[in-house]
Amino acid sequence: MGTFTYERQVYLADTDGAGVVYFNQFLQMCHEAYESWLSSEHLSLQNIISVGDFALPLVHASIDFFAPAHCGDRLLVNLTITQASAHRFCCDYEISQAESAQLLARAQTHHVCIALPERKKAPLPQPWQTAICDLDHP
């Protein structure tokens, strides 16, 4: 299975009063990794928004936490695609410390392609299917 890796530093704004990454920021980092992967595949979320013939709503998100991260930490977000079909796909994420490889969190997001304006399930456009297949089956 192929993996896309996104590296990110933890900033002070990512942390809470206890000095650790606030829980929702881990999901934000996952979405940053997703957008970075799309960019590497020349797939534009802005193009989806401006053309407006389909959308990829996130219909489920889950995350499990194993260890904290702190301001200044370098993190790796590894993204793999699972459970891909003609109209949906799941992104699995593992967030770890860049230096020690300690696993901090695992997350998953489910995305479904819908036609607009009907908002009915639709097949993913071919460029998306190709990119997903490339990451799902290297």
From Swiss-Prot:
Disruption phenotype: Cells lacking this gene accumulate DHNA-CoA, lack phylloquinone, and display photosensitivity to high light intensities. Its EC number is 3.1.2.28. It catalyses: 1,4-dihydroxy-2-naphthoyl-CoA + H2O = 1,4-dihydroxy-2-naphthoate + CoA + H(+). It is an enzyme of class 3 (hydrolase). One of its GO terms (biological process) is phylloquinone biosynthetic process. InterPro entries: 4-hydroxybenzoyl-CoA_TE (IPR050563), DHNA_CoA_hydrolase (IPR022829), HB-CoA_thioesterase_AS (IPR008272), HotDog_dom_sf (IPR029069), YbgC/YbaW (IPR006684). The keyword Hydrolase applies. Catalyzes the specific hydrolysis of 1,4-dihydroxy-2-naphthoyl-CoA (DHNA-CoA) to 1,4-dihydroxy-2-naphthoate (DHNA), a reaction involved in phylloquinone (vitamin K1) biosynthesis. Is not active on benzoyl-CoA, phenylacetyl-CoA and aliphatic acyl-CoA thioesters. This is 1,4-dihydroxy-2-naphthoyl-CoA hydrolase.
